A protein has these predicted regions:
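Active-site beta-loop-alpha junctions enriched in small/polar residues
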Residues: 6-10, 32-36, 65-67, 116-118, ...
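Active-site acidic/histidine proton-transfer and metal-coordination neighborhood
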Residues: 54-55, 70-186
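Glycine-rich, proline-tolerant flexible connector loops at the mouths of alpha/beta enzymes
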Residues: 30-50
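N-terminal small/glycine-rich loop or linker at the start of catalytic domains
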Residues: 1-4, 65-68, 123-125
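Short glycine/serine/threonine/alanine-rich loop segments
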Residues: 26, 58, 158, 185, ...
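Histidine-acidic metal/acid-base catalytic patches
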Residues: 2, 11, 15-22, 71-73, ...
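Alpha-helix-loop-beta-strand connector modules within alpha/beta enzyme cores
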Residues: 47-65, 142-152, 238-244
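Generic enzyme active-site microenvironment
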Residues: 28, 61-63, 161-163, 188, ...
């Protein structure tokens, strides 16, 4: 089990993030493609990222754009997202040697992705999700996505990991289970997200516990719903979640949103047995 940090908005540059990662004794940074400085054209300048990481003896994972929507009904949009994934996989292949040098070679390099809920139509008595209404079309998009990713990843030690956010829809669970039929896909458990929605994703996640390889670790509460808190500032049974991550040999991102909360979380782990 290794711990890393997210891309933090307070840090304006890659070097700012790396300096913080090194100071806190963390192993990796999860590069967030929602930030302008980590857009695909920037990430493709891999020599810059590799040189900076080697100087600090760290490596990277990648968080795909949260807006990623490979099932968009507009083929121009879905094809752009597919091309984004293809090129990001090529970036990850070039970053893999950093994992080999400074990480754990038993842990695949991960590209973290969210499930895009799609749009819904509000009727007088209910909301109808378009992906639920046109489920066959939705699943055809995921079949194409899975086939493409298997081809693009090839034999590289890279996994695309699906993260829980604000509650998986039933149609999303079916799509995720379809993806998990492929060895190139696994799961991320964001323990703060699940706490903030009353743990309703936990039964689904635990039914696929053998596919858990990545965790987003932060504290949270149910009432009021909060997440991305420093460890110890919420209601989560952190030891239970950390023990599961350890048993799964999972990589863990301390996904707070501020430097202060990240520092506090590292201190919390240092005081806990066997984590950092």
């Amino acid at each position: 089990m290794q711990f890393g940090m997210p891309t933090l908005i307070e840090n304006k540059t890659l070097n700012d993030n790396i300096a913080l990662c090194s100071r806190l004794g963390l192993k990796f940074i999860e590069l967030n493609m929602n930030f302008p400085e980590y857009q695909l054209d920037k990430l493709e300048e891999t020599d810059i990222f590799i040189k900076a990481a080697e100087q600090a003896h760290i490596y990277y994972t990648i968080h795909l754009d949260e807006n990623l929507n490979i099932a968009d009904f507009n083929s121009l949009v879905s094809e752009a997202y597919l091309e984004t994934v293809r090129r990001t996989i090529e970036v990850a292949k070039k970053l893999l040697p950093l994992r080999d040098k400074y990480g754990d070679q038993t842990q695949p390099l991960t590209l973290n992705m969210h499930m895009n809920h799609g749009i819904y139509i509000t009727l007088p008595d209910r909301k109808v999700q378009m992906y639920d209404r046109d489920f066959d079309t939705y699943m055809k998009s995921f079949a194409h996505f899975r086939d493409c990713c298997e081809k693009w990843i090839g034999d590289a030690d890279i996994k695309i990991v699906v993260e829980n956010t604000d509650g998986f829809r039933d149609y999303e669970k079916k799509a995720i289970e379809f993806l998990l039929e492929s060895p190139d896909f696994d799961l991320t458990w964001d323990i703060g997200h699940s706490k903030a929605i009353g743990e309703k994703d936990v039964p689904f996640i635990k039914s696929h516990v053998d596919r858990l390889i990545h965790f987003h670790i932060h504290d949270g509460s149910e009432n009021p719903p909060k997440n991305h808190l420093a460890l110890g500032d919420g209601e989560i049974d952190l030891n239970d979640r950390l023990q599961l991550a350890k048993s799964r040999n999972a990589r863990c991102v301390l996904e707070t949103k501020t430097i202060e909360a990240l520092e506090k979380s590292v201190t919390y782990l240092k005081k806990s047995d066997g984590y950092i």
